[in-house]
């Protein structure tokens, strides 16, 4: 039995070395993705500094993603879902930073406050805040696609009054809850 110990230990050591060597490139790729995401985050803050300073937009660095939160007032008229020219210009400045290599998945989520839909919107087929938020998210997604973003890499979801970021008891809180969030996973994902 003792004559088999050396080859066993040698084999196990060799396998362990191979496994460790295989981890190094993965760590390097992960660091490259993190660095690319950090660069995008910094670019967004520089490019959108006016909107961020005016509290129209918030840019958040997550662990493996960037989230851009845009107040609905910047994008849509009250109760509406068609983007203004200013909104198109704003989203147009974000697109080259969020989707430079057309490899990153972009999720567009629409949110509303909890104020019930009025009769005018009901006549237009908007039966709930969920439907309104879906239309808004889809409008932003369609605009992004019209600007060259790969349709396979962008999705839209309306979440209505779910996940409020502020109290719906005040006009300021309701304004904060009416938003669109664009979340992009790390570059190259």
What are these regions (language model features)?
Residues 2-13:
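Bacterial N-terminal signal peptides that target proteins for export
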Residues 18-22:
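C-terminal motif of bacterial Sec signal peptides marking the signal peptidase cleavage site
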Residues 24-27:
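Bacterial signal peptide processing site
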Residues 29-60:
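Post-signal peptide N-terminal segment of mature Sec-exported envelope proteins
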Residues 46-54, 79-110, 114-116, 141-145, ...:
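Periplasmic peptidoglycan-binding/anchoring modules of Gram-negative envelope and division proteins
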Residues 52-54, 63-65, 69-71, 93, ...:
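Extracytoplasmic
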Residues 63-92, 113-127:
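Short, solvent-exposed beta-strand/turn patches at coil↔beta or beta↔helix junctions
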Residues 111-189:
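Periplasmic OmpA-like peptidoglycan-binding domain that tethers envelope proteins to the cell wall
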């Amino acid at each position: 039995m003792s004559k088999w110990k050396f080859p066993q230990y040698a084999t196990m050591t060799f396998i362990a070395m191979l496994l460790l060597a295989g981890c190094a490139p993965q760590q390097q790729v992960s660091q490259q993705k993190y660095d690319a995401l950090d660069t995008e985050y910094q670019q967004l803050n520089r490019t959108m500094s006016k909107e961020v300073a005016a509290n129209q937009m918030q840019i958040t660095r997550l662990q493996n993603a960037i989230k851009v939160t845009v107040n609905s007032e910047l994008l849509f008229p009250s109760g509406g879902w068609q983007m203004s020219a200013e909104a198109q210009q704003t989203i147009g400045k974000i697109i080259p930073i969020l989707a430079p290599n057309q490899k990153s998945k972009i999720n567009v989520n629409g949110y509303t406050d909890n104020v019930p839909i009025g009769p005018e919107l009901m006549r237009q087929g908007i039966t709930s805040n969920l439907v309104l938020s879906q239309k808004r998210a889809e409008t932003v997604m369609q605009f992004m696609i019209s600007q060259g973003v790969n349709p396979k890499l962008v999705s839209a979801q309306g979440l209505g009054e779910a996940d409020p970021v502020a109290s719906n008891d005040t006009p300021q809180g309701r304004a904060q809850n009416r938003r669109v969030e664009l979340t992009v996973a790390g570059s190259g994902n």
